[in-house]
Amino acid sequence: MGLFIFTLELKAHTMDIRHYLDATYLKTAAQANLSEVENIEVVKKAIQEAIEYQFKLIMIRPDQVLLAKELIQKARSKVTIGTVIDFPKGEGSVEKKMKEAQVAIANGADDLDFVINYKAFIKGAIEEVKQQVIVCTKLGLDHHKIVKWIIEVAALNQHQIVQLTALIKNTVIAHFSEKEYEKVFVKSSTGFYKTPEGVPNGATFETIKLMLENSFPLPVKAAGGVRTHEEALAMIQLGVKRIGTSAAKAIVTSEISNSGY
């Protein structure tokens, strides 16, 4: 255990954790129990924090992309903008996903995080899922965007996590060039899947290991449940390339306060 902690401490001094963080705010006003005006203020605060702390990306709802673009350009910041497509259930048709993605692209999104139709996958509709991956990934890559496929690990058993991760990987390898692989992620979770009390609905070390073992050469994004500096470092140590979290500020603040140790 001591060696593992020492390794993490070494890693903390050789990389900037902010480059891994997709600072995330995806609650609607109703979900946050706020008015629309109050919720937009929360969104603005999240965007400003991403700018201030120089996170890799701010992840917000599609109807907030233009706002993020305006604030980031005004600040002359390098923070990129991500949004979610067919969120959070992923049950929409290819056409629905494409339409949402086209609007997000037009509004200035850099990353497109699609929720895959995991329910169709569970039911055995493999070709339908493959077609989603092919068509939507092509749209994103043709517009020089990063594409991420959310598989919703909390809805899957271990065997299904392995199968769906491998399906995305094999589909991308079969239809896109090697230079594009690093631009197509497999992502763990929406953070909105309802689980029994006490059961995690996001990334766990166990599920991320399964994804990493079966996604290569595609990168993995751990999303949901990563809330501390130590957890973020451990995920990076495992091999994830991005971390989606609503606790990005706390993660970085912890890093700053612990930097002398």
Regions flagged by a language model, labelled:
Residues 111-183, 191-194:
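Conserved anion-binding
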